[in-house]
Amino acid sequence: MESFDDSRCSKIREGCEQHGLHLGLHTLSGVNIAEISPHLREAADAYLRNYIDLSVKLGAEWIVVHGGYHFTGCQKIRKQASIDRIKRAVEYAEKQNALLLLENLNGEPELAEVHYMPDNLEDTQEYFEQIQSPNLRWSFTINHAHFDPIGIKGFVEGMDMSLCEEVRVADNNGEYEIHMKPGTGNVDFGEMFRLIESSGFKGHYMNGFGSLDDMLEGREYLLERAVEQGIGINS
């Protein structure tokens, strides 16, 4: 983040404007936004504020954020710390005219010591119930939902899809966290597009797997699945 001085930010912003590119930022899921320890609490707040400031300098249209993670015996206190911290970040984003997108993260085995937040439908709903702002919307990662017991359909039917700004796409084996190239796992992408597009979704899709070449190639596969469902494509 320190490398983004005024000169670099100006060049990136000008390049996006010149080529008609839409730029978004994505914070690291490894940074624990549910931090409760002295010094680290303040650092987590500063981390989010700095991303918001950077988005303004770059002209980025959104910032994907995460709820952090908890350990075995501290779920309640860390979840509330996470919600409170994101609430503070949203208040700052409102002042800076920045848009935050909260991502649903992947579930871990039930007996795992560490668990991400939010990692299921109920937790995702809770975050949006406690933080209501036009500057906080949902980034729906479908491969995380795919190996949840309720699946992609359960999330689409259970969430208020008017909150959804971004759909993050990768294939998955239905068993554990892995971002696979579309067509190599068992996600039914035709059905995924049908569910999401029929929900009134008006946001953007974002590939999240492999290399840049993998994602460009995967884009063509995904477009074919969408066309098979009769979904109009704007090139």
Question: Where in the sequence are the language-model features?
Answer:
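Active-site acidic/histidine proton-transfer and metal-coordination neighborhood
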Residues: 17-18, 34-137, 147
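N-terminal pre-domain/capping segments
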Residues: 1-57, 129, 133-135, 153, ...
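Histidine-acidic metal/acid-base catalytic patches
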Residues: 61, 112, 121-235
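Surface-exposed loop/turn and secondary-structure junction residues enriched for glycine/proline
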Residues: 4-7, 34-36, 108, 183-185, ...
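Catalytic-core regions built around general acid/base machinery
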Residues: 7-20, 85-92, 154-155, 191-195
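Active-site-proximal loop/turn and secondary-structure-junction residues that shape catalytic pockets
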Residues: 27-31, 67-71, 104-108, 142-146, ...
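Short phosphate-binding/catalytic loops that engage adenosine nucleotides
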Residues: 21, 98, 201
